[in-house]
Amino acid sequence: MAVPKRRHSKSRTRKRRSTYYNELEPPQLMECNNCGNPKVMHRACKHCGHYRGRQVIEPSDELIA
C-alpha cells in the first residue's frame, strides 16, 4: 500500500476538502399541491404537513409565524 513521503500542509488539505461544498447543488424546490408554499422534493411540506395528498405530520405554529 502506498504511503505519502511527506506530510500535506493544513492549507493544502483544507483546499482539497473545500471544493466538495462548492460542487453541491441546492435542494430542488417544488410547489406544495395542498397549500402552494415551496417545499423540498420528496419531503413533507413544513407548512401544512401534507405529502402525496395525505396529512403525514402535524404542522407546527412556529414554522408558520
Curated annotation (Swiss-Prot):
Pfam families: Ribosomal_L32p. Residues 1-18 have a biased composition (Basic residues). InterPro entries: Ribosomal_bL32, Ribosomal_bL32_bact, Ribosomal_zn-bd. SUPFAM superfamilies: Zn-binding ribosomal proteins. PANTHER family: 50S RIBOSOMAL PROTEIN L32 (PTHR35534), LARGE RIBOSOMAL SUBUNIT PROTEIN BL32 (PTHR35534:SF1). One of its GO terms (molecular function) is structural constituent of ribosome. GO terms for cellular component: large ribosomal subunit. Belongs to the bacterial ribosomal protein bL32 family. Disulfide bonds: none annotated. The keyword Nucleotide-binding does not apply. Keywords: Ribonucleoprotein, Ribosomal protein. Residues 1-20 are annotated as: Disordered. It comes from Salinibacter ruber (strain DSM 13855 / M31). This is Large ribosomal subunit protein bL32. One of its GO terms (biological process) is translation. It comes from the Bacteria.
